[in-house]
Amino acid sequence: RENQQIIVWHARLNIIFDVIRGLVYLNESADGCVVHRDIKPRNIILDENFSAKIADFGISYILTEATQYTHEETWTESGVPPPDYAQEHTHIAGTMGYIDPEYMTLRKLTKKADIYSFGILLLNIVSGKKSIEQIDEGLLSLEELAWKLQKEDRLNELIDPPLVNCNGFNLSEILRTTMIAFWCIQRESKLRPSASQVLRMLSSEEEIPTPQVPNKFHCDYSHSSGDDSWTSQF
């Protein structure tokens, strides 16, 4: 970490915006719905100005017209999220720590799988931590850690320490981004916002309701190396 370049918050936020705009294009294009299935730090390419592009479409999947759902009503307008049609899969693809748990359990792929992965990516960017960490008791997911700190009103402890001393540190903006991440990683895909809704939240064009805290976690990380962190690529 000592020899790694610290990316200031403003640059990290620009990366976030670049990625979500990419997902809006992929998930909500008029030409069809592309689900990337492997949104994670190592699949985000940065140039010298920290502009970001989504890369590695090796396991991406195109949802057919019959399985897509398009609706003008947003999740917040009615209070009840609209249905999200799915494509059934027998083979689960992705990276442990970023795979939508509902996709793993039900084996039905929706574009909300990318939103879940994006939520974990947000937590990576805010915290500088791996998606899965080795601790004395075994493996701890970043998702579990974030929810634990949220429930204990200690969310400030999630923030990447070097960020605090960097120019442009904005605590309220970072915490707002974390709240958006919590909505993206809701266990039920129908509770997650769409990519365009996430973009509006990040742009402060849409309110962020209080996220629902899950009662428990079901993911099995026993076969994961947990080696994919936001800062490891710098």
At which residue positions do the language-model features occur?
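Conserved catalytic-loop position in the HRD/HxD motif
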Residues: 38, 43
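Activation segment
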Residues: 106-111
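Intrinsically disordered, low-complexity cytosolic regulatory tails
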Residues: 65-86, 93, 137, 159, ...
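Conserved catalytic-loop aspartate of Hanks-type protein kinases
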Residues: 114
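Protein kinase catalytic-loop region centered on the HRD/HxD motif
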Residues: 21-34
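Activation segment of protein kinase catalytic domains, centered on the conserved DFG
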Residues: 2-17, 167-171
